[in-house]
UniProtKB/Swiss-Prot annotation:
CDD domains per record: FTHFS
Main EC class the enzyme belongs to: ligase
Organism: Lactococcus lactis subsp. cremoris (strain SK11)
Highest taxon, organism lineage: Bacteria
Signal in keyword set: no
Name this polypeptide is given: Formate--tetrahydrofolate ligase
UniProt: ATP binding residues: T65, P66, A67, G68, E69, G70, K71, S72
Reactions catalysed, as given in the entry: (6S)-5,6,7,8-tetrahydrofolate + formate + ATP = (6R)-10-formyltetrahydrofolate + ADP + phosphate
Gene Ontology MF, one: formate-tetrahydrofolate ligase activity
Pathway(s) served: One-carbon metabolism; tetrahydrofolate interconversion
Entry keyword annotation includes Nucleotidyltransferase: no
Keyword terms: ATP-binding, Ligase, Nucleotide-binding, One-carbon metabolism
Catalytic activity, EC: 6.3.4.3
Length: 555
């Protein structure tokens, strides 16, 4: 079979103006970025404001293997399947970060015959949104350090600056740096560090903002440091929220592209789900809900991370809950959770599937606990055997849950027709949605609910630093914000090697970081990194471009 990029390059891509017409947008309703990409201005959303929202389908997954389980692929293929059934459908996805693209994953725009196009553009610089976020983030750093240099009128304690610079690459050497060296003309020396851009609070702010004015208000609230009296210092205190919003005004507009089969797709925003909230932008999802009858969207990593955050964080800003949830499962991931070594995952092992099913079962029950109907999509791989597939189907159906074997990677929309048909029936009912916690509950209760009710743990321990931070959060009146757990994606726990569905474990919160602009409190668990490193053999080693500009090796 051809590689993803070979399939994408051989596909017949339509002018973006034709894709816009499918969802009722005229030439004047879009801003072209070349022939195959466009942005949708915010006024267009206002134009369709009275339109009834379409149905919303959330695609999530079990705890993944390092290679991922194909959530984006299933999301795209499912949208194409609905389109084949003459449904007015759109897909809403996150945009990829260059760090993982050049590092371990390669491209991140779906796979096989279920991809979004133009694949190379989306995976590289796209419309420049992530670069704008990088610039906006680092501009705040520059203004902060300038304030220190110019007499420190805000009385900022350089030892208590929490705002870091960012870069959209994996670069471990930048995690801890010293800046301001070289004498008085070069600023105030202090310790600093870099995060990957998609971990920046600016990314989360962009993805949760609903307008330019909301964006400005959120930017102003971002806490960047403490002063010598241990009081918070914000971007608003620097007085640069207007300038930063100016840098982001175009990045705030959703990006319109298409799938291989010509289904309209909005790709906008890309926060990681293990260190941020892991969902595409509220504006993109809102826009899709106004323009389509069915919207398929995804949330990063497993249902314990992106899924939980979509439901407890994003939906509160979106004003709309999913009408159904698709949990993507693969036999290779179930076998990994069943104790099989990663090198043996392509070999048949029915007993490991049975043992690893505990992971899928917990994810199903977690999503059902929100009052949502759930269907399992088995993302089929060539190594899957009939006995493994039938075992997984039987185990899932024994829970009273629908299951569908999807082959969208190999067959595109055709491979998702059964899933689309079963979902159509599920979408007729209105779910009785309920949140995991209420915003007015104490932060300690919210943490406890996520750990005990979603993860299956028994207790939350706070480090001395986290205890102090919790007191400061309460003193500053930030207790009514949702929690955003930052942890490993491979396990329900904070330990990557604790697979399947562990119980009775304790988790330790290392730090509680207030992201007041985004509107949540990040709880750092385990050793999760906000600036990844490159592997020994980065994916970039296989990438190249010919003399005539044709890209190869991008997954």
């Amino acid at each position: 079979m051809k590689t993803d990029i070979e399939i994408a390059q051989a596909a017949e891509i339509q002018p973006i103006t034709k894709i816009a017409e499918k969802i009722g947008l005229s030439f004047d309703d879009i801003e072209l970025y070349g022939k195959y990409k466009a942005k949708i201005p915010l006024e267009v959303l206002e134009k369709f404001d009275e339109q009834t929202d379409g149905k919303l389908v959330l695609v999530t997954s079990i705890n993944p293997t390092p290679a991922g389980e194909g959530k984006s692929t299933v999301t795209v293929g499912l949208a194409d399947a609905f389109a084949r059934q003459d449904k007015n459908v759109m897909v809403a996805l996150r945009e990829p970060s260059l760090g993982p693209v050049m590092g371990i994953k390669g491209g991140a725009a779906g796979g096989g015959f279920a991809q979004v196009l133009p694949m190379e553009d989306i995976n590289l610089h796209f419309t420049g949104d992530i670069h704008a976020i990088t610039t906006a983030n680092n501009a705040i750093s520059a203004f902060l350090d300038n304030s220190l240099h110019q007499g420190n009128p805000l009385n900022i304690d350089p030892r208590r600056i929490i705002w870091k610079r960012v870069l959209d690459l994996n670069d471990r050497a930048l995690r801890h740096v010293t800046i301001g060296l070289g004498g008085p003309l070069n600023g105030v020396p202090r310790e600093d560090g870099f995060d990957i851009t998609v971990a920046s609070e600016i990314m989360a702010v962009l993805c949760l903002a609903t307008s330019i004015s909301d964006l400005k208000e959120r930017l102003a609230r971002i806490v960047i440091a403490q002063n010598y009296d241990r009081k918070p210092v914000s971007v608003g205190d620097l007085g640069v929220q207007g300038a930063i919003a100016m840098l982001l005004k175009d990045a705030l507009k959703p990006n319109l592209v298409q799938t291989i089969e010509g289904t309209p797709a909005l790709i906008h925003g890309g926060p990681f789900a293990n260190i941020a909230h892991g969902c595409n932008s509220v504006l993109a999802t809102k826009t899709a809900l106004k323009l389509a009858d069915i919207v398929i969207t995804e949330a990063g990593f497993g249902a314990d991370l992106g899924g939980e955050k979509f439901l407890d964080i994003k939906t509160r800003q979106l004003g709309k809950q999913p009408d159904a949830v698709v949990v993507v499962a693969t036999l290779r991931a179930l076998k990994m959770h069943g104790g099989v070594d990663k090198k043996e995952l392509t070999s048949e092992n029915v007993e490991a599937v049975k043992k690893g099913f505990a992971n899928l079962e917990r994810h199903i029950k977690n999503m059902q606990s929100y009052g949502l109907p759930v269907i399992v999509a088995i993302n089929q791989f060539a190594s899957d055997t009939e006995s493994e597939i039938s075992t997984l189907k039987e185990l899932t159906e024994a829970l009273g849950v629908s299951v569908s074997l999807t082959q969208v990677f190999a067959k595109g929309g055709e491979g998702g027709l059964d899933l689309a048909e079963k979902l159509s029936a599920m979408l007729q009912a209105k779910p009785d949605f309920r949140y995991l916690y209420e915003l007015n509950q104490p932060l300690s209760v919210k943490l406890d609910k996520v750990v005990t009710e979603i993860y299956g743990g028994s207790k939350v321990n706070l480090s001395p630093k986290a205890k102090r931070q919790m007191r400061e959060i309460e003193e500053n009146g930030w207790n009514n914000l949702p929690v955003c757990m930052a942890k490993t994606q491979y396990s329900f726990s904070d330990q990557a090697n604790l697979l399947a569905a562990p119980e009775g474990f304790e988790v330790t919160v290392r730090e509680l970081i207030p992201k007041i602009g985004a509107g949540f409190i990040v709880a750092l668990l385990g050793d999760v990194m906000t600036m990844p490193g490159l592997p020994k053999n980065p994916a970039a080693l296989k990438m190249d471009v010919t003399d005539d500009g044709k890209i190869s090796g991008l997954f």
